[in-house]
């Protein structure tokens, strides 16, 4: 094999490795986004279940709502963490102890705008 052929083979291999890294990075971002949305959905379900069980209507004040949903022996055992490195905030729009109206998220991710860690459709949530 000549030096030129060897150089071409190395360049092709490096190009393929580069494409592989970009693909893996895109896959990781997508899986982080999906898991983040699952966390948001689970907390939303837990909040709705708690409010239905104890008779809190949307917009009502539910004392210690976050600690009633998340914790040992609760609907969600541990506080979720965003796999993409974002931070979750609870009750950002209506308050931590207020049951939000239907279609409004109780927990939001700080990466919702930059990495789209936000569900596309939430009217029934």
Predicted regions and their residues:
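N-terminal single-pass transmembrane signal-anchor helix
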Residues: 1-24
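Single, functionally critical "micro-switch" positions that shape active/binding sites
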Residues: 4, 38, 84
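Short linear sequence motifs
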Residues: 14, 20, 43, 80-83, ...
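Conserved hydrophobic/amphipathic alpha-helical signal-anchor segments
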Residues: 17-68
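Periplasmic/extracellular, small/polar-rich flexible segments of pilin-like filament-forming proteins
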Residues: 49-125
